[in-house]
């Protein structure tokens, strides 16, 4: 067992959302955990409060005494800590391999898919918690009810996100898996081949043992395409009545979704029951159906499912409501923050906002993430951004990429302006965005702050500015 051979575990890039969660679980299991990161953030502060040594920056000395070094995808081979570890013959492994090791100690439930992983993982953990199963979880966002993105439970299950962006989900060996959808994103990883993307998801499903079970969303065209090649046991879910688990009578009730769940899954009692999900959006109905499927498979009751969905307190940066902010011209606007950065998930979130607040003006502040994604999905971005009532665009968050002139925010603004419906406002520096938004907003507006980059700092700055009014 790992515990007999490994004592000290060092994380390079420990502040990353996937890394910090695994570090916390290992710390709670009794391992001596340390880590380093270029930037301080809420995750590094939280880990420090637990007694974990977090070093600012990267130097070779940080790996001294480590039995294994864990790296995130963002960490380069030239990193001085990685170089020093290899020179000292200390194993250097990717984050997903350490997650796979955690799964060896418990029954793993791995949630994969291009969109909806974090919410589905969180909903699954919430229902299993309501069922008294006390799961361990590692999530790509902060579960609001727990105040953290990871927790060591006493139960037999571990619920974790499975990351397809670098194909690292192929390291995992869960007993149950979910595929929420498949979309053409991170295509550099798959040589820009849809066939290779499909094969990766098939291989992920086949990582389960013969007694495992996958839950696959048939509302996704790409998921439907791989079904004939899946040879492990699976059940389908979706909004179509041919699915093994499906939803009808879907209704927006304010910022909640009410719907009827129908179960016609082999080996389970057939029937239907009503649920209320404490978050808006039809896409979240699908995420809830996946969590319901997993919950039924592990023996959770209908009552536990209803309790887990109604009591769900949400996830950080997934339609996260900050409440009303005061405006300089009088009145207030509701501030909502979201991680969405792909046109498909953005469209779903904007539809959720329209459904929850149908009479309100919707103002979007958006920071595109990566020049290559903006280039590859330029038309899709233009279409979805043109659906709001007012738009403020800040410059692309490069994530280490070189700028691409025809795929920056100025180009997006020009393309949207040509369509004739909106006059986008361009904000070159994201630091200027809070003040700019206060001048754009009107009483009663919904302002949606969206993106996966440095725009995540805007809500706190906007709230601070608003307090001074």
UniProtKB/Swiss-Prot annotation:
Pathway: Cell wall biogenesis; peptidoglycan biosynthesis
Enzyme Commission number: 6.3.2.8
Catalytic activity: UDP-N-acetyl-alpha-D-muramate + L-alanine + ATP = UDP-N-acetyl-alpha-D-muramoyl-L-alanine + ADP + phosphate + H(+)
Molecular-function GO terms, alphabetical: ATP binding; UDP-N-acetylmuramate-L-alanine ligase activity
Location, primary (coarse class): cytoplasm
Residues annotated to bind ATP: 113-119
UniProt similarity note: Belongs to the MurCDEF family.
PANTHER family: UDP-N-ACETYLMURAMATE--L-ALANINE LIGASE, UDP-N-ACETYLMURAMATE--L-ALANINE LIGASE-RELATED
Protein name per the record: UDP-N-acetylmuramate--L-alanine ligase
